[in-house]
Regions:
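Canonical Rossmann dinucleotide-binding motif of NAD(H)/NADP(H)-dependent dehydrogenases/reductases
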Residues: 6-44
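A conserved structural motif in NAD(P)-dependent oxidoreductases
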Residues: 229-240
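Short, small/polar-rich loop/turn modules that mediate ligand/substrate recognition or access, typified
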Residues: 186, 191, 255-257
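Residue(s) in the substrate-gating loop at a strand-loop-helix junction
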Residues: 153
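Short C-terminal tail/terminal secondary-structure segment
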Residues: 2-6, 158, 202, 244-245, ...
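Substrate-binding pocket helix/loop in short-chain dehydrogenase/reductase
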Residues: 109-110, 114-122, 225
Length: 271
């Protein structure tokens, strides 16, 4: 990753969910773990799969002086999420920054999508954010403050080329959830913001989305996605991570209840 001024998060503890990837490369959670570690944060990396976090751990441990601990958790289960927060405190003593990054889509409109698939989409993309905030907010309040960055998607604000009503609804709800919590906890020195990635080139695109939307043809899917972006190229997890870093840092001390769209201009097109 590119070189930046070091130490913007020195002494801070980051808890990031969805810190693994389905393959090599820069997923959002992996990039957040690495980028925040580069800036001095101690990283508590969480994913449902320990194997998915192996590259994340290796990349962070390659940074001189970096500290990282991994933890497996099903973030749709309240008891496991509470245990996740407790484990982070046991290891690092506190949680200064929470980045909720778990997410995944399922194709289908209200007729095609099964009720079971709908429930899973809401649990995975929205309930996970609710539970993590539910258990971290009292801790941050007791600590005297903190910063939360929730990851939504341009699917939550625009049509992005495919019917995925469960995913889009959940991500739209994440945006409004963040606004409500931001106002409620502003006087407690807890900032809550949302980063909204667009159609990024991440490991999940190649491993899963190509099969859902382009008959397994990765190049065709990448071409479709890139054609929608005014800047003419797709970003990756590092772009999402840099946006989250700004929102989590003291540089954003006067920003709460806001959304930062990272999509190369895609969402402002009208064609």
């Amino acid at each position: 990753m590119s070189q930046h001024t070091q130490g913007r998060l020195a002494g801070k503890v980051l808890l990031v969910t969805g810190a693994g990837c389905v393959g090599p490369g820069w997923g959002n959670g992996r990039a957040v773990a690495v980028r925040f570690a580069e800036e001095g944060a101690k990283v508590f990396a969480v994913d449902k799969s320990a194997e998915a976090m192996e590259e994340t751990l290796a990349r962070v441990r390659a940074i001189p002086g970096a500290q990282i601990e991994s933890h497996t958790c099903d973030v749709t289960q309240a008891s496991e999420v509470k245990g996740m927060i407790d484990a982070c405190v046991a290891r690092f003593g506190r949680v200064d920054i929470l980045v909720n990054n778990v997410g995944g889509s399922a194709r289908g409109g209200p007729v095609d999508l099964t009720e079971e698939a709908w429930d899973k989409q809401i649990d995975f993309n929205l309930k996970s954010v609710f539970l993590a905030c539910k258990y971290v907010l009292p801790l941050m309040e007791a600590q005297g403050g903190g910063a939360i960055v929730n990851t939504a998607s341009t699917s939550g604000i625009r049509w992005t080329g495919a019917a995925q009503v469960g995913y889009a609804s959940a991500k739209a709800a994440v945006i409004q959830f963040s606004r409500v919590v931001a106002v409620e906890y502003a006087k407690k020195n807890i900032r809550v913001n949302t980063v909204i990635p667009g159609q990024m080139h991440t490991p999940m695109v190649e491993a899963r989305l190509a099969g859902q939307r382009a008959g397994g043809n990765v190049d065709a899917l990448l071409a479709q996605r890139q054609a929608r972006i005014p800047l003419g190229f797709m970003g990756d997890g590092r772009d999402t991570a840099n946006a989250a870093l700004f929102l989590a840092s003291d540089e954003a001390r006067f920003i709460t209840g806001a959304e930062l769209i990272v999509d190369g201009g895609m969402s402002v097109r009208c064609d």
